[in-house]
Amino acid sequence: EKAGIGKSIDAIKRADIVLLVLDASEPISVQDQQLGGFLRENTKSTIIVLNKWDLVENTMMRKVSPDGKKKGGLADKDSDAFKNDFKQNIYASFPHLDFAPIIFTSAKTKYKIHLIFPLIFRAWTERHTIVPEDELKEFFKKVVKEHRPSRGKGTKHPDIVSFHQLHNNPPMFEMMIKFQTSIHFSYVRYMENRLRE
């Protein structure tokens, strides 16, 4: 297993876009989570491919009727509700990859294999995006107005002095704050999520 992970890490280092292929019929392993963390740390565009979807059995799930009352029932594995629930479980295991699209596939039956390449092209396009300066300024004003920056250490509320894009592939942005203030890491994460939108 260590040799396999070593090869995966070497391949990840050379890649811009990575397909994290998981067996949908098996629990997520510690090694899967470690690879997911490595992807995040190395700023790789990631697509989570849930393979072997044909082996996932229909499962008893609590269904909610339109009036909000819960009732038991058999949930179809191809229903949106079941897939959304499955996605939430995946994101709970990979919280650092909550930006990555998830696709349900089966290499054996060819189920939705054709949808992988459009996701790769989209990831490539987004990775090479340069946001025009005027759009970035508008985005920045809107985001700061909606959610004021939260302070990290200290008593002073942080003032963001500037926000601009340094480069693309991967897109890298710089936020400068006023001297002797600090910004909470959760606000940086918030800005990151808003940029992805």
Task: Report the location of each language-model feature.
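C-terminal-of-GTPase-core extension/linker across diverse P-loop GTPases
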Residues: E1-D10, R14-L20, E26-E197
